[in-house]
């Protein structure tokens, strides 16, 4: 057990920014989330997708400034934007296989690039119940 704790503490000391892009399904809505999973801030974060992604009203979500440049993304911070309702997204027969290329820099200016592949098809058949609006 002591060995695992040593490895974990060494990993956190050596941590560098780790930025991901994820698609989130919640109560019938699809969101795109940009998250810094690490204990270190990320700088000059940009995301490019391998194709256009159309959201509400057919707008190209990829064109949002959010994906072009986030000057500073704090440790453990997530920025989320609404993509569309799952019903609308899938009824337009939008692509379900999407690749996101994430570029960011650490404090010293070292550039890191990663690609994450997503398949939104996993969300097509998920059931959900619309909750009525509640007031406290």
Predicted features along the sequence, with ranges:
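Acidic, serine/threonine- and proline-rich intrinsically disordered appendage/tail regions
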Residues: 18-22, 33, 107-136
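A short beta-turn/strand-edge loop motif at beta-sheet boundaries
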Residues: 39-44, 92
């Amino acid at each position: 057990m002591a060995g695992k704790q040593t490895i974990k503490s060494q990993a956190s000391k050596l941590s560098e920014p780790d930025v991901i892009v994820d698609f989130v399904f919640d109560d019938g809505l699809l969101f795109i989330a940009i998250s810094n999973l690490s204990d270190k801030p990320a700088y000059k974060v940009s995301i490019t997708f391998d194709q256009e992604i159309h959201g509400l009203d057919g707008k190209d979500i990829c064109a949002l400034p959010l994906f072009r440049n986030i000057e500073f993304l704090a440790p453990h911070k997530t920025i989320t934007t609404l993509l569309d309702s799952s019903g609308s997204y899938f009824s337009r027969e939008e692509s379900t296989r999407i690749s996101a290329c994430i570029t960011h820099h650490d404090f010293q200016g070292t550039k890191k690039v990663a690609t994450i592949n997503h398949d939104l098809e996993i969300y097509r058949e998920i059931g959900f119940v619309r909750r009525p609006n509640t007031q406290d």
